[in-house]
């Protein structure tokens, strides 16, 4: 119903708690912690299919919706697709499970293996 563009904020959680979905429209993004934060607050994720992060985090679109940034109408088509989804709650649970691989401890283990 309503979309608010509020710019940069230090505490995103107070906004996430009031939302239903999170849209990431970046042209380039590493595994964005903002997506992890959105998943932790049970938001459905709609993201551009930019290099690296979103595709990996959303399991190549199986746990959220990916759209192509450079194709006219893709974002609006993704929003329409979201409104027609039947298992949004199940999908949100699957997205939230992905957050477990992005803890500080997991990053430490990966870095430790790289430095061996």
Where are these regions (language model features)?
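Aromatic "clamp/platform" in nucleotide-sugar-dependent glycosyltransferases that forms part
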Residues: 8, 27
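Donor-sugar nucleotide-binding helix/loop cap in glycosyltransferases
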Residues: 38
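Nucleotide-activated donor-binding/catalytic signature segment of Leloir-type glycosyltransferases, i.e.
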Residues: 1-7
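A charged, aromatic-enriched C-terminal amphipathic alpha-helix characteristic of glycosyltransferases
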Residues: 66, 87-116
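Conserved acidic donor-binding segment of nucleotide-sugar-dependent glycosyltransferases
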Residues: 60-72, 80-86
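A short alpha->beta transition loop at the rim of the catalytic pocket in nucleotide-sugar-dependent
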Residues: 13, 20, 42
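Short hydrophobic beta-strand element within catalytic cores of glycosyltransferases
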Residues: 44-48
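Short glycine/serine-rich donor-binding loops of glycosyltransferases
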Residues: 32-35, 54
